[in-house]
Amino acid sequence: MPGTSVSDLSTATAVDAPALLPLPVARPSAPAVVRGKLYIKTHGCQMNEYDSAKMADVLAASEGLELTDNPEEADVVLVNTCSIREKAQEKVFSQLGRWKALKAGGKPVIIGVGGCVASQEGEAIVKRAPYVDLVFGPQTLHRLPELIRARRESGKSQVDISFPEIEKFDRLPEPRAEGPSAFVSIMEGCSKYCSFCVVPYTRGEEVSRPFEDVLVEVAQLAAQGVREINLLGQNVNAYRGAYGADAGDAAQYADLGLLIRTIAQIEGIGRIRFTTSHPLEFSDSLVDAYRDVPQLANYLHLPVQAGSDRILSAMKRGYTALEFKSRIRKLRAVRPDISISSDFIVGFPGETEADFEKTMKLIEDVGFDQSFSFVYSRRPGTPASDLQDDTPETVKQARLARLQAHISAHAASISQSMVGSVQRVLVEGPSRRDPNELTGKSENMRPVNFPGNPRLIGQFVDVLITEAMSNSLRGRIQLDDSAH
């Protein structure tokens, strides 16, 4: 179906889609006057990458701060933290200790801590590292200009780790495209409270952005040349975006499937991805979107965590291994060749060898293409942190190595099977491996390197895969006029 322009969206409809308000065409804004330098160190997930980009946008617009990759020349240095992995707090304080020297000689450098560790630790960060000027959570990054001004005027450290729901999205500047692919956050937080996870405590309960607000951001990015949209959320397929007169009591709600259908009609958007999902929220509506929307990438990341029902219950995941496989079967009925990746936690408290073998059986049955897998890391304040854990670390590491080796071997076989096929690739830029070549990603998230004209950057091209490498593919453009 032909693309829908921004101005046409007031009348565009998807299957069961609401009538939408006219969306503004993005116009280039005047560049801010540069009044200083900003350095941001980002740890963790894609949500943090998105948040860091928004911090940069906010401070460029309000304070005239320009990004630098050298903290020593920065006027403001920020670390955007992640609390998922073990010893996250200690890593943050180690980073801060290295930055303390930036204030030597009385240089008025602002040092700030954001992200999930900031939410967890709050005032404790300033007590332990009194040279820290700002502590702010994921929901208050939009208040950075006010926090910086308050710090400079009062001379006191500022801490704001509140949860003002979706307010931050209302106070962010217009998005700026940094390439042909862009992330768009559509919701915040998680309400699942898995026993091992800190996210509900650091990012709050699930809150969805209004439906039309998301479409406005996507349309603005498309007008700037973005061709691939990555929809983000801690539990992205729980999205319920309000739309209607005032998005109030009488509002209706769009789920992720409807959002995808509608985004697919925006002119210029040629590919849609989303992450991260929860199996409990993997609805028939989403399966139908995979069936009906060709722009929806032939790839799904769906964290299962374990294959043992006993361990899944202890994790409070809310589904069984059989129920997970049932969802995959439904999806493969409409997308038989879809690539599926997942998350695994090995060595969860009480995991026996039999439990682990059930995880390996699930991996064999599903045929995962990629995985993000780790040994269980105890997170203070979570229910699982109180569980007895008597499995030796050497056993856990051996299990993890076996799991990763199995999935890596299967992924290699998939890559090899792609040799001789034609893959649709979004050209992202010059290859890091060889600047004379171009690089992009296939639908199943494999880097593809190939010779080509730099003018193709930002376009989709059909690439004939000629070789499978350990972590990438090589190929050549199938036709000279294949860009579209």
Swiss-Prot record:
- Its top-level enzyme class, in one word, is transferase
HAMAP family to which the protein is assigned, alphabetical: tRNA_metthiotr_MiaB (MF_01864)
Q: Which GO terms describe its molecular function?
A: 4 iron, 4 sulfur cluster binding; metal ion binding; N6-isopentenyladenosine methylthiotransferase activity
Gene3D superfamilies recorded = Methylthiotransferase, N-terminal domain, tm_1862 like domain
> Which residue stretches belong to region Disordered?
428-450
Taxonomically, the superkingdom here is Bacteria
Name the family the entry cites.
Belongs to the methylthiotransferase family. MiaB subfamily.
Q: How many and how are cofactors bound here?
A: Binds 2 [4Fe-4S] clusters. One cluster is coordinated with 3 cysteines and an exchangeable S-adenosyl-L-methionine.
Which NCBIfam families is this protein grouped with?
Answer: miaB-methiolase (TIGR01574), MiaB/RimO family radical SAM methylthiotransferase (TIGR00089)
Q: Describe the location of the Radical SAM core domain by residue ranges.
A: 176-415
Q: Determine if Transmembrane helix is one of this entry's keywords.
A: no
Oligomer status and interactors: Monomer.
Keywords assigned by UniProt, alphabetized = 4Fe-4S, Cytoplasm, Iron, Iron-sulfur, Metal-binding, S-adenosyl-L-methionine, Transferase, tRNA processing
The UniProt function text for this chain reads: Catalyzes the methylthiolation of N6-(dimethylallyl)adenosine (i(6)A), leading to the formation of 2-methylthio-N6-(dimethylallyl)adenosine (ms(2)i(6)A) at position 37 in tRNAs that read codons beginning with uridine.
Q: Which GO terms describe its cellular component?
A: cytosol
- Catalytic activities: N(6)-dimethylallyladenosine(37) in tRNA + (sulfur carrier)-SH + AH2 + 2 S-adenosyl-L-methionine = 2-methylsulfanyl-N(6)-dimethylallyladenosine(37) in tRNA + (sulfur carrier)-H + 5'-deoxyadenosine + L-methionine + A + S-adenosyl-L-homocysteine + 2 H(+)
Annotated protein name in UniProt: tRNA-2-methylthio-N(6)-dimethylallyladenosine synthase
